[in-house]
A protein has these predicted regions:
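Short, ordered loop/turn segments at secondary-structure junctions
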Residues: 35, 100-102, 124-126, 154-156
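C-terminal substrate-binding/catalytic lobe of Rossmann-fold NAD(P)-dependent oxidoreductases
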Residues: 7, 12-63, 144-267
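Short glycine-/small-residue-rich Rossmann-like dinucleotide-binding loops
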Residues: 70, 76-77, 100, 206-208
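Extreme N-terminal starter segment of soluble prokaryotic enzymes
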Residues: 1-4
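Rossmann-fold NAD(P)-binding glycine/threonine-rich loop
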Residues: 82-91, 98-121, 130-139
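Residue-level detector of anion-binding/catalytic polar loops
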Residues: 71, 94, 118, 148, ...
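Rossmann-like NAD(P)-binding element
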Residues: 63-83, 89, 93-94
Length: 267
């Protein structure tokens, strides 16, 4: 039985992860974490998540919670994730990281800390999106420079980072497939007299509104035709299910950095 701890336990994602853990064989919740000033501290994690009493109090003591777990599932913010990973590394546990919005320097810090543990880092845990990553790479390689690559992502109005981590990963995959460096060809804003589109540009546009869980579309524009690859998430359960699948998979794995492509056998 894999013993899991969940950060952000009183948040939208944390609640769904706790619910999915309860419905999944081979894994159990042993700890729930929130920040030191959260209103839910001391409350039962199951009751806060809406799944009934579990006998596990939400705590801000990351060290104590991680110590009794096998794997930490972390959907928080970059600075919090880095702090949590340091504790996971200290106790030689495993981690599943779904946080997004990392800067280049922050991601390097994450990789450095996580290098001596078994750790999954993925901007999107859904099965559909991870299959989409593979399809986008294949389409980009096949269509090559004859097709313009653009993408649009939409999320709920409360999302703090933009573009989404998933959109950035899709753009990176497409750029790699056609031999380009996204930092050189990525275009994240167009306004005014921008001139004609550069042949090698990869555009990423962001929309925010309502309660959209997550929509991503990659467009390949050719002459006289257009290919669209779209994924729409209608429930956070798709991410929670992937995270729990990842927690089951990573337990007992050799130290190293993995992603959901490894978990799903898509590599």
């Amino acid at each position: 039985m894999v013993k899991a701890a969940v950060t952000g336990a009183a948040g939208r994602m944390g609640a769904r992860i706790i619910s999915v853990i309860g419905d999944t064989e081979g894994i159990e919740l042993v700890g729930a974490i929130e920040h030191s000033e959260h209103y839910a501290l001391g409350q039962d994690a199951g009751e806060v998540a809406g799944v009934g009493k579990l006998g596990i109090e939400i705590s801000s003591d990351v060290d104590a919670v991680v110590k009794k777990a096998d794997v930490l599932i972390d959907f928080t913010f970059p600075d919090v994730t880095i702090e949590n990973l340091a504790v996971v590394s200290k106790h030689k546990k495993s981690a599943v990281i779904g946080s997004t919005g990392f800067s280049g320097a922050e991601m390097e810090e994450v990789k450095k800390i996580a290098s001596n543990i078994s750790c999954i880092i993925a901007p999107n845990m859904s099965i559909g999106v991870n299959l989409m990553l593979k399809l986008v790479a294949e389409a980009a390689r096949t269509l090559g420079d004859d097709f313009d690559i653009e993408m649009v992502e939409t999320h709920h109005k409360l999302k703090k980072d933009a573009p989404s981590g998933t959109a950035m990963k899709l753009a990176e995959v497409a750029a790699d497939a056609v031999g380009r460096n996204l930092s050189e060809v990525g275009v994240f804003e167009r306004f005014g007299m921008t001139g004609a589109r550069g042949k090698k540009e990869i555009g990423v546009q962001t929309l925010r509104g309502g309660d959209v869980v997550g929509d991503h579309t990659v467009y390949f524009y050719g002459t006289g035709e257009r290919l669209e690859i779209t994924h729409r998430a209608t429930s956070r359960d798709t991410f929670a299910t992937g995270a729990v699948k990842g927690a089951l998979w990573i337990s007992g794995k050799a130290p190293g950095l993995y992603d959901m492509q490894d978990v799903l056998g898509l590599k």
